[in-house]
Amino acid sequence: MFPERGASEEEVLRELEEKTREDLTFDSGKILGSMCTYPHPFAVKVVMKYIDRNLGDPGLHIGSQKIEKEAVDMLANLLGLEKGYGHIVSGGTEANILAVRAMRNLAGIEKPELILPESAHFSFIKAAEMLGVKLVWAELNDDYTVNVKDVEKKITDRTIGIVGIAGTTGLGVVDDIPALSDLALDYGLPLHVDAAFGGFVIPFAKALGYEIPDFDFRLKGVKSITIDPHKMGMVPIPAGGIIFREKKFLDSISVLAPYLAGGKIWQATITGTRPGANALAVWAMIKHLGFDGYKEVVKEKMELARWFASELKKIPGIYLIREPVLNIVSFGSEKLEELEKELKARGWGVSAHRGYIRIVVMPHVKREHLEEFLRDLREIAKRL
């Protein structure tokens, strides 16, 4: 019920504290299945300082709009492009929807079809329903990457584009994006890469010597990329990114908003009102950590993920789904449902994903947290 009379701040905060006691918190070390993390303290400071900025009305916040553009260009540069076109958006879901919308609008085809891997994120299902696009699912290889030959088989005159994944949600697998890029160029189709997770991991992992195929704008067939700063970028939620290679993609999804303070403003994002503070935090975190800073974060988590995977192999009844590619480790068990239930009963924030449990070694995850998890896992697996 909407209260007739207000309560004091202390009373409201006390009630909030009581009602959120069931929430798991990142600092507990119990959240192991999330692709988000506790934001960097500096990013929190920036958001708090600029909490009132609205990028949906850039005429009021001209400086913030310019900073967003700089943030987009820095992300584009990280992804192999000197200058990019796009926005800081609510997350990977919105970014993927915008990419599909751009492909559909530019193609101008009746009954449009989009080819994507069976491993693709559910946001593409939302995009398809919203935009009237038929999804054509491509099979996976034994290593869980998309079968490029199957992608080619499914190209028709109704195909508006192809999707590749750089860091799948379940396993952190990176598709053969170079082969998909060549295929897209051969057929004159745009390739969208969903690097919501991998975008803030792969460039740094490659610099560290990890053998991961190219996935970004260095490949000519790649026309758009989703990247989420609120994942490994450690920016407060919400902060996703959509980057286009060419301005025509952004123009194709822009609509006129004539009543705003800046005059005739063209708006491409799904959300009208947008938190400028988070875009500023993206800019600030990139400036603060730089490539070397993020490389150190990725180095620690990639090494920790590989140690964790090696420990899992020692537990009877537990098996890896595949060797980790990024900082995601997924494992299975013959008694997965019971195992998941027992782990949750002990307070672990994990979930069974398509027949396995996924552990994401995010910045908040420390070795001591994983050691505690392994102790519980060994005990439960032995009893089951």
UniProtKB/Swiss-Prot annotation:
Description of the deletion phenotype: No growth on standard medium. Growth can be restored by the addition of exogenous beta-alanine or coenzyme A, but not by the addition of GABA.
E.C. designation(s): 4.1.1.11
Biological or metabolic pathway of the protein: Cofactor biosynthesis; coenzyme A biosynthesis
Cofactor section: pyridoxal 5'-phosphate
UniProt-recorded name of the protein: L-aspartate decarboxylase
A Gene Ontology BP annotation from the UniProt entry: carboxylic acid metabolic process
Transmembrane segments: none
Subunit and partners: Homodimer. Can also form homohexamers.
Enzyme class: lyase
Keyword terms of this UniProt record: Decarboxylase, Lyase, Pyridoxal phosphate
Similarity-based family: Belongs to the group II decarboxylase family. MfnA subfamily.
Annotated control of activity: Inhibited by hydroxylamine.
PROSITE patterns for the chain: DDC_GAD_HDC_YDC
Function noted in UniProt: Catalyzes the decarboxylation of L-aspartate to produce beta-alanine. In vitro, can also catalyze the decarboxylation of L-glutamate to produce 4-aminobutanoate, but this activity does not seem necessary in vivo. Shows much higher activity with L-aspartate than with L-glutamate. Does not decarboxylate L-tyrosine.
Recorded GO MF terms: aspartate 1-decarboxylase activity; pyridoxal phosphate binding
Modified residues (N6-(pyridoxal phosphate)lysine): K231
